[in-house]
C-alpha cells in the first residue's frame, strides 16, 4: 500500500470542542446542511500514522482516499471515536499492481488544545491506534484488485451489473503464479452504515459498491448507460 511520511493530518470542525471552550474570535466559516449548522473555527487537531506502519497482512498502511468517523464520544478531557480509513488502489507510480483493496479501522483519541497559539503551538493531539483491516472481495468471495481494468470484458454475477475486471498472469506483481481475473476497484469515497456495512465509490466503473461488515460485495450501483464505456458493443 502507499505509505506517506506524514499521514492523516486531520482538521476537525470544532463543533465538539466548542461545547466546552468559549470562542472570542469569529469562525472561519459556517454552513447549514439539511437543517444542521456546522462551524469551522480552525485547525483543532493533528496527528500522523508512522510511515513504516503495517497492517495485519504485512502491507504498509495508507488512508489517503477517504475517512469515516463513527461512535464519537466524550472521554475525560478529550474525545474518542472509531475511524475507518480507505486507501487508494496501491502503489502505482510505474503502473498498477495486484493490491487487494481494503479498509483500515483505527481507534482515535482527540484532546483539544484551546490555549494553543501561533506563537505557542500545540503538539500532536490526535492519536491513531490501529485495530484491524477488512479486505474487500467480490460477491463470490474472491479478492478484488487494484489493477487497471483490461479489454477482455468485465465480470458479471447474478443480480449484479457487469463490473470492470483485470486479467493478470502470475501473481499480479510480476512473480510466478496461476494468474486470475478479478473485479477492479479504485476506491475514492467511503460511508459507513450503522450495521457495520459500508459504501465505497469507485473511479474505475464508476460504480457505487456496498460491502457487508466483512468486506464482501453485496450491492453494485451502475452509472447510467450514457456514461458507460462501450467498445464493440460491450462494456469495457
Give the role of each language-model region.
Residues 1-20:
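Fungal secretory targeting signals
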Residues 19-236:
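Sequence/structural signature of beta-propeller domains
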Amino acid at each position: 500500500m502507499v505509505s506517506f511520511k506524514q499521514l492523516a493530518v486531520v482538521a476537525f470542525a470544532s463543533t465538539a470542542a466548542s461545547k466546552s471552550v468559549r470562542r472570542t474570535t469569529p469562525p472561519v466559516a459556517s454552513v447549514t446542511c439539511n437543517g444542521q449548522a456546522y462551524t469551522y473555527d480552525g485547525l483543532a487537531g493533528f496527528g500522523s500514522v508512522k510511515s513504516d506502519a503495517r497492517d495485519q497482512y504485512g502491507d504498509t498502511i495508507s488512508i489517503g482516499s477517504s475517512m469515516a468517523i463513527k461512535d464519537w464520544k466524550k472521554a475525560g478531557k478529550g474525545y474518542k471515536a472509531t475511524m475507518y480509513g480507505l486507501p487508494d488502489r496501491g502503489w502505482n507510480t510505474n503502473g498498477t499492481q495486484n493490491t487487494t483493496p481494503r479498509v483500515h479501522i483505527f481507534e482515535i483519541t482527540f484532546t483539544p488544545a484551546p490555549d494553543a497559539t501561533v506563537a505557542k503551538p500545540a503538539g500532536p493531539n490526535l492519536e491513531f491506534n490501529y485495530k484491524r483491516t477488512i479486505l474487500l472481495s467480490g460477491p463470490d468471495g474472491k479478492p478484488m484488485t487494484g489493477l487497471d481494468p483490461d479489454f477482455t470484458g468485465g465480470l458479471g454475477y447474478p443480480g449484479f451489473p457487469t463490473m470492470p475486471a483485470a486479467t493478470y498472469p502470475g501473481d499480479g506483481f510480476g512473480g510466478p503464479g496461476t494468474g486470475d481475473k478479478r473485479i477492479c476497484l479504485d476506491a475514492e469515497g467511503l460511508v459507513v452504515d450503522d450495521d457495520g456495512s459500508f459504501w465505497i465509490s469507485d473511479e474505475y466503473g464508476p460504480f457505487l459498491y456496498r460491502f457487508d461488515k466483512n468486506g464482501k460485495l453485496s450491492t453494485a450501483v451502475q452509472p447510467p448507460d450514457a456514461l458507460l464505456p462501450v467498445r464493440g458493443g460491450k462494456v469495457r
